Design a protein with these regions (language model features):
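Conserved subregion of the PPM/PP2C metallophosphatase catalytic domain
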Residues: 3-158
């Protein structure tokens, strides 16, 4: 479904709006999904993205780490609506992390969350990749297990 929409609609906001329309019609009451939809344009050096109730992308460059601003929007499948998008110009070297709340909300035995600060610190490491981040989250959880899905995608240009 997403692939078909991506081929027929131009922007992340349009794709999320159409996908949401389809899911509102099909999802049982109380069901929803969050996501960030992003389009990387290497030729222009930009990332255009829209959020449906999902956490913001994390951009790391030579100046450090920052969470990309955008309207979060409602999760998909709740009610009809539209989404906004933002475009960021990417530096020559960067790393972008897209991640689920299972990463930031993972807890240790003291019930402390992994959080966004630890996420940003880890993603700034030169060796950071999805495997090292997931390993760090599991190590932080110290045997308590993960209560939610822990998903991460990283895009890099070095």
């Amino acid at each position: 479904m997403l692939r078909s929409l991506a081929e027929n609609f131009c922007t992340p906001a349009e794709v999320l709006t159409k996908l949401n329309h389809l899911l509102v019609e099909d999802f049982p009451s109380g069901r929803f999904v969050t996501m960030v939809y992003a389009v990387l344009d290497p030729g222009k050096g930009t990332l255009t993205y829209a959020s449906a109730g999902h956490l913001p992308p994390l951009l790391v460059d030579s100046s450090g780490a920052r969470f990309l601003e955008t309207e979060m929007g409602l999760p998909l499948g709740i009610r009809h609506g539209s989404f906004s998008e933002a475009t960021v110009e990417l530096p020559e070297r960067f790393r972008i992390a897209l991640y689920s709340d299972g990463i930031t909300e993972a807890t240790n035995p003291e019930d402390e969350e992994y959080g966004t600060a630890r996420l940003a610190t880890h993603v700034q490491r030169p060796d950071a990749c999805p495997d090292t981040l997931l390993g760090d989250v599991r190590s932080f959880a110290n045997g308590t297990g993960l209560r939610d899905d822990a998903t991460v995608i990283m895009l890099c240009r070095k």
